Amino acid sequence: MNRDSFYPAIACFPLLLMLAGCAPMHETRQALSQQTPAAQVDTALPTALKNGWPDSQWWLEYHDNQLTSLINNALQNAPDMQVAEQRIQLAEAQAKAVATQDGPQIDFSADMERQKMSAEGLMGPFALNDPAAGTTGPWYTNGTFGLTAGWHLDIWGKNRAEVTARLGTVKARAAEREQTRQLLAGSVARLYWEWQTQAALNTVLQQIEKEQNTIIATDRQLYQNGITSSVEGVETDINASKTRQQLNDVAGKMKIIEARLSALTNHQTKSLKLIPVALPKVASQLPDELGYSLLARRADLQAAHWYVESSLSTIDAAKAAFYPDINLMAFLQQDALHLSDLFRHSAQQMGVTAGLTLPIFDSGRLNANLDIAKAESNLSIASYNKAVVEAVNDVARAASQVQTLAEKNQHQAQIERDALRVVGLAQARFNAGIIAGSRVSEARIPALRERANGLLLQGQWLDASIQLTGALGGGYKR
């Protein structure tokens, strides 16, 4: 070995010795792997559902100002959104707090002390009043002021890993806020269209009640004229009572829905006034294929992903704790035993200190912290894998439900058309003077009941479509 290579080797020897003296790191846990479902998921979907992803403000497609206003109020005033927003601000503040530890710090300090020296103590000579010896005891007023600086050198990347972990938490909280936003919007939309369904059903039931009252009035007139017996009108009276009971049930459901909407929109101070509107025909939206796109569109999966990234950075920080900590410190001060001498050049003092902390024996504390970090990371990965499977199942289940209800609506529409043809025939016979007007009412009642069934199916279809939009992430984009 020549002299040029000998001295660098000697210089590196203390560093190698320090690293060898660090507390040993034990690998006790095996990391889980993140699941990518694209290759395992059957992405075949009905052709009628392949119309593209929903927009992030998907509720605007209904062109309903009432619904838009309700959702906007919920997003602005709902306590859940306020909690989600505060969680983001807390995570951002925590990330900033960790990031500040990675830079130098400079402090200014000043102090003044009035003290009497003990003649019998270690500083006994200073208790004497001997100007020739430089002592003016026993009382002294000493002062110090100046700058102190410190810098923790993040050689092994511990602080950087902690900052990355905190930033991952911030991104996860932002995704959770978006998930809360979509859940709130979906809940408000579902309740709103359920109310509109009940309002439309209420109108149809009132029409049924009107036709039943027409039949009852006709039967009573025939009975009074001695043409029919009282028994023939009993069944109509019973049906009218059932219709009235259904109307009461519908009114009760509408009040419950209004109360729930008021709670979601934080609208308890004044009563909620809704105007009935026609139920829309919602076009189901789903991409041609699922897979990686699904992961990018679900806010809950993005939150789970960022929690995984954060946990991996936490592992890096736990590993970096096994290596030496190096700190640099410096000070520049004025220090004098008498205040009158404090600003003299001779009172100046300065210094630089380099400190090193080497973990050697810690009773397993560092390994325990590393095990905790790895366990939390594995838990985050397992939660992510579970969320992926559940997300794919949610989409498949919601898509199947939308398709099934779409087919039921088609069949119901045909049934309603057939029932209307029966009403048309009865009306024609009435116009020809063949039957009485009450018989037309009797023909209208089954058609109206089928219309009520159609409204319920249409409401179920709307509800399933909104659930499908939520399963697709509600148009969420990173």
Can you name each region flagged by the protein language model?
Residues 53-62, 109-148, 271-287, 316, ...:
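Small/polar, glycine/serine/threonine/aspartate-rich low-complexity segments that form flexible
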Residues 23, 175-290, 401, 405, ...:
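Periplasmic alpha-helical coiled-coil/stalk elements that build and connect Gram-negative outer-membrane
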Residues 67-69, 90, 142-144, 190, ...:
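Transmembrane beta-barrel architecture of outer-membrane proteins
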Residues 52, 60, 75-77, 97, ...:
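Amphipathic alpha-helical coiled-coil scaffold segments and their short linker/junction regions
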Residues 2-76, 124-128, 167, 251-293, ...:
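Terminal intrinsically disordered/low-complexity segments used for targeting and assembly
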Residues 82-83, 99, 139, 153-181, ...:
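Sec/SRP-type N-terminal targeting helices
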Residues 223-227, 430-434, 471-475:
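A short glycine-centered flexible hinge/capping loop motif at secondary-structure junctions
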Residues 71, 144-148, 192, 291, ...:
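Membrane-embedded beta-strand positions in outer-membrane beta-barrel channels/transporters
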